[in-house]
Amino acid sequence: MHAFQKALAAAAGLAGATMLGSRYFYELAIPRRSKLTIHGRGQSPEQKAAQRKRMEGFERWMAEQPAEDLWAASFDGLRLHAKYIPADEPTDRVMILVHGYRSSPLNDFGEMLPFYRDRMKMNLLLPDDRGHGQSEGGYIGFGWQDHFDVETWIDVMIGRLGPSASVFLHGVSMGAATVMITAGDPLPKQVRGVIEDCGYTSLVEELTYCMHHYYHLPVQPFLAEIDLCTKRDAGYRFEDCDPAAALRKTSLPFLMIHGDDDHFVPSFMLDRNYDACASADKRKVLIHGADHALAYVTDRALYEQEVSAFIGARA
């Protein structure tokens, strides 16, 4: 009996530790927070300071643009916000730029905005993802709930630009997962192509990688407990967030970009997403030396060359 009681006590202790640990990771990952992610986990303090200085430059550039605040209602009743920046000359081409986890349009796309607007002559739509910026929402959607929001913004842009609109999607990190999941749904014919930069194959695989790589923890039972909390509070399951599964259903043109020095979403996920993609019109590009979400700043010339060719052939 004494041994049995000790076993029960040990089991209770393990269960309690699992619940506490799972709650810690849930609070770390799922609820809304205001702090931005600074890309490049291995960056020095000097590099991070330089990135913050660049952000100040992006904000000055944005302040000089004739940007308009747009609002839309999500499928579940949230008020969504986006900035719309028209091209200098009238055009029916628009790029919808979908930012990543705990980030913002300026943080992820600030350096690209002049390229898209001034060189590619495109209108720009910069949505704040649900749970970020001026959009409502108390939880991170990891691409699942968010992809419905992207479809809402697609409809808003077609309504604004008319039936001749050419709509492109470009997502970074979690935003890349979002646009891949979006591509698996039936979309209006005005959607011409999708660019995904450092997107994960599935949320389960990404969280499994992070728990092993950064925390050196077994995936279970933690992941199952966090998943239950997420379903209860945020309304989705981790298995819903599956870009690779969505790619098996798409016929849209795809440009897939990844850095070969990405230690957050490892570059092997580029190959898995590419292989999963059912589109006959797809291309993958590996940027040498690029950390997570830093492919553009690492090799701007190659990035712009690939994007220019992709859009130019399909707009």
Located regions from the model:
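Alpha/beta-hydrolase active-site loop
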Residues: I140-L161
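Short alpha-helix in the alpha/beta-hydrolase fold that links the catalytic acid
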Residues: P243, L252, P266-D275
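Conserved alpha/beta-hydrolase
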Residues: Y116-E136
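Hydrolase active-site cap/lid region
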Residues: I181-Y236, A245
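An N-terminal hydrophobic leader/cap segment in hydrolases
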Residues: A7-A72
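Short beta-strand/loop motif that positions the catalytic acidic residue
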Residues: K249-S251, M256-H258, D262
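Catalytic histidine-centered segment of alpha/beta-hydrolase-like enzymes
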Residues: A290-E304
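The serine-hydrolase catalytic nucleophile loop
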Residues: Y101-F115
